[in-house]
């Protein structure tokens, strides 16, 4: 299973995360408290042993091109309603690996209908982006309506995000069966990545592989 621990800010956090995760991420051009500068992102990307995704809510080709060129990243995670043709242009011009995030409602009165609408939206990106991520949105650290995620996971490969932590990951992954997980605040203590929480998260996640 693909494991991404996002929102690192320092070399110290990177050194911890890369021992346990398949990928990590840095937050750029965002209102998030985890936002860092292009210069810091470049520093982390250059020394990382695992892929670092540049994660942002920017929604234009020019803004993403600037991020890619300033940081040297080959991995991006798009959290916006960016025009599909501009995403294709990014892929063609920079050959970046792309995770495209889709927001799932916190609570849905009609999960089947919401899942159908999301599937129709997601299928436009088939063979264009590399991974599909389902998230609650805006790094809230809260789960979304998992009934929707379950329906989608039965039809397509998804990376699940939103409110995951060491204490709920086992049950949630058993229900949803995603191909990957992505989290940030769920393994933080005092606003920093905590190695003991990460180890516990991985232990409980791996329980599902037995």
UniProtKB/Swiss-Prot annotation:
GO terms of biological process kind: L-tryptophan biosynthetic process
UniProt keywords, alphabetically: Amino-acid biosynthesis, Aromatic amino acid biosynthesis, Isomerase, Tryptophan biosynthesis
Enzyme class: isomerase
EC number(s) stated in the UniProt entry for this protein: 5.3.1.24
Catalytic activity: N-(5-phospho-beta-D-ribosyl)anthranilate = 1-(2-carboxyphenylamino)-1-deoxy-D-ribulose 5-phosphate
Highest taxon listed in the record's lineage: Archaea
GO molecular function: phosphoribosylanthranilate isomerase activity
Metabolic or biological pathway, per its Swiss-Prot or TrEMBL entry: Amino-acid biosynthesis; L-tryptophan biosynthesis; L-tryptophan from chorismate: step 3/5
Gene3D superfamilies: Aldolase class I
InterPro entries with a match to the protein in the record: Aldolase_TIM (IPR013785), PRAI_dom (IPR001240), RibuloseP-bd_barrel (IPR011060), TrpF_fam (IPR044643)
SUPFAM superfamilies: Ribulose-phoshate binding barrel (SSF51366)
NCBIfam families: PRK01222.2-4 (NF002304)
Family statement: Belongs to the TrpF family.
Protein name, as recorded: N-(5'-phosphoribosyl)anthranilate isomerase
Source species: Methanococcus aeolicus (strain ATCC BAA-1280 / DSM 17508 / OCM 812 / Nankai-3)
Lineage per the UniProt record: Archaea, Methanobacteriati, Methanobacteriota, Methanomada group, Methanococci
Record gene name: trpF
């Amino acid at each position: 299973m693909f494991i991404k621990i996002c929102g690192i800010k320092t070399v110290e956090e990177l050194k911890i995360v890369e021992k346990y995760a398949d990928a990590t991420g840095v937050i750029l051009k965002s209102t998030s408290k985890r936002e860092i500068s292009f210069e810091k992102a470049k520093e982390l990307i250059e020394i990382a042993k695992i892929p670092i995704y540049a994660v942002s809510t920017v929604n234009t080709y020019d803004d993403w091109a600037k991020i890619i060129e300033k940081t040297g990243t080959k991995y991006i995670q798009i959290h916006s309603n960016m025009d599909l043709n501009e995403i294709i242009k990014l892929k063609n011009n920079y050959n970046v690996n792309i995770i495209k995030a889709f927001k799932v409602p916190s609570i849905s009165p009609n999960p089947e209908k919401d899942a159908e609408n999301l599937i129709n939206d997601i299928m436009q990106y088939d063979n264009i982006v590399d991974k599909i991520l389902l998230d609650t949105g805006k790094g809230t650290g809260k789960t979304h309506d998992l009934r929707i995620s379950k329906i989608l996971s039965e039809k397509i490969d998804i990376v699940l995000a939103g409110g995951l932590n060491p204490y709920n990951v086992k049950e949630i992954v058993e229900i949803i069966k995603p191909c990957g997980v992505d989290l940030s605040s769920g393994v933080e203590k005092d606003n920093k990545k905590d190695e003991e929480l990460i180890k516990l998260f991985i232990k409980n996640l791996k329980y599902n592989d037995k």
